[in-house]
């Protein structure tokens, strides 16, 4: 994978691989599924998901990361992924007007997602949502909103990407 200096990438490769494997397993993706990879960074989760999905749309605000994601899809010969340079909340508000997704994998920053994103997520009603977070407090806040919208938590799996530190 290509990673530019301003792009985000998990530095603990061994744990990241386990995290992505579990996320894809929990997403239960099939060849007919449309998957949104929100807050996609350099596209790693979406590229991994693309091997099982019909179509993947990665959304990321950092334009350099989107450039990396497109290159990463190309060098991995992935054809069923599209990357969009946009705020995930703004993108989902527009997307919810005309389209549906079967699966949304979201990996927002430590500050969590936005009410606009979460409300739009509730409008498109994906069958499955996988929420990856490094901020348990903001994840709990966001999940509370999703639960109020009709979703239920079926699994929770911690991964220690920063061993021997206070970071989750």
Name the predicted role of every residue range.
Residues 1-168:
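Rossmann-like S-adenosyl-L-methionine
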């Amino acid at each position: 994978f290509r990673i530019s200096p301003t792009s985000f990438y998990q530095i603990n490769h061994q744990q990241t691989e386990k995290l992505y494997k579990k996320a894809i397993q929990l997403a239960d993706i099939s060849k007919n599924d449309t998957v949104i990879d929100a807050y996609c960074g350099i596209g790693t989760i979406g590229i991994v998901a693309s091997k099982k999905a019909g179509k993947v749309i990665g959304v990321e605000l950092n334009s350099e990361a989107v450039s990396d994601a497109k290159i990463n899809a190309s060098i991995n010969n992935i054809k069923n992924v599209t990357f969009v340079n946009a705020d995930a909340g703004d993108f989902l508000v527009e997307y919810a007007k005309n389209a549906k997704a079967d699966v949304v994998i979201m990996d927002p920053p430590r500050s969590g997602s936005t009410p606009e994103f979460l409300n739009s997520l509730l409008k498109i009603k994906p069958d499955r949502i996988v929420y990856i977070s490094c901020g348990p407090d903001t994840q709990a806040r966001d999940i509370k909103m999703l639960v109020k919208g009709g979703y239920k938590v079926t699994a929770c799996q911690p991964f220690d990407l920063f061993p021997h530190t206070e970071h989750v």
